[in-house]
Amino acid sequence: MTNPFVVLLGLGMALATSVADAQCAVEKRCGWLKNPTPGNFSLLDRSGEWTISEQGGYQAPGIDNMPDMTTKGWVVTNAGEHGYGCACLDVQVDEKSRLVTRLVSAQPLPLRRCKLDPKLPPP
C-alpha cells in the first residue's frame, strides 16, 4: 500500500519543478536591438524594453557570445558603430525586473522586418 504522504510529496515536487521550468523557459523575442553607447544593450519588442547589459553593471550571461549584429542593417546613431538594428534573440527573462537573465542566441534581421511590424514601437 502506498503512503499518501509520499504521493503528496511527489506531486508537490513535480509541481515545483514544472513552475521552475516555466520560469526558466527560453523565449524567442524579436524587435529593436539597441546599443546606444559602449556596454549598453537592450531589446525593444512588442511587450516593452528588456535590459541585456548596462555599462559597468549588469551583464546577461551569454552576451559575450552575441554575434556581429551589424550584418543585416544597422543604424549608427553614435560614435564607434553604436546604434540599433532589428534582431531575434533566444532568451530567458525576468518579467518583473525586465532583465534578460540569459542570452542563448541572437540573429540579426533586415531593418525592414522591424519597420513593417505594426505592433513594434519605433526604436
Per-region residue spans from a language model:
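Beta-strand-rich cores of mature extracytoplasmic or soluble domains
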Residues: 64-123
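Positively charged n-region of N-terminal signal peptides that target proteins for export
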Residues: 1-4
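Bacterial N-terminal signal peptides
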Residues: 6-16
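N-terminal secretory signal peptides
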Residues: 22-77
